[in-house]
Amino acid sequence: MLSLRNATEADLGEIRRIYEYAQDYMIRSGNPTQWGHFYPSADLIRSDLQKKVCKVIYDETGIHGVFALFDGAEPTYAHIEEGEWLNDEPYVTIHRLAGDGRVHGLFQCAAEHCKLLSPNVRVDTHANNTTMQRLIEKNGFKRCGIIHVMDGSPRIAYHWTAR
């Protein structure tokens, strides 16, 4: 059974290994531009750890997944094109979800945790990341439109609401 906890500095090696696996997987799967081999950077991972937003998903055999969970307004979500958010209520955001390829259910575990924290959860992904799109939609999120991340590149924006 999968569990979730706050990541610690002791997890840094496993977290980096998981992100490296995910980078390679995305490139092999036809999504070479979302992360490439450079995102997330070591500095960004350390920042997530320091801010206590980095979460790990694990079972009795070890850590299998990682993501960042943010509570509050996401600046890149302020403007959405080709649609609209389901509501303007406070929300949490899932960012940088990655897995090691050894277990299934990582997004479901992260989403269920977030749904307990907030009646509104948002997430975005690249148009070429069809694996993530399927997982997001399978977990009840609605496609709302297109947002642009800090570098200006577009992402498909999703929103789940309990209401």
PLM region descriptions:
Residues 68-102:
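Conserved acyl-donor/pantetheine-binding loop and adjacent beta-alpha core of acyl/acetyltransferases
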Residues 56, 62-72:
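Conserved beta-strand in the GNAT
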Residues 43-56, 73-75:
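A short helix-loop-beta-strand connector motif used in the catalytic cores of GNAT acetyltransferases and
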Residues 124, 142-156:
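Conserved catalytic-core motifs of GNAT/GCN5-like acyltransferases
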Residues 99-116, 134-138:
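Conserved acetyl-CoA-binding loop-helix of GNAT-fold acetyltransferases
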Residues 3-17:
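A short beta-loop-alpha structural element at the N-terminal edge
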Residues 116-128:
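Conserved GNAT acetyl-CoA-binding A-motif
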Residues 23-43:
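Conserved GNAT-fold acetyl-CoA-binding loop/helix
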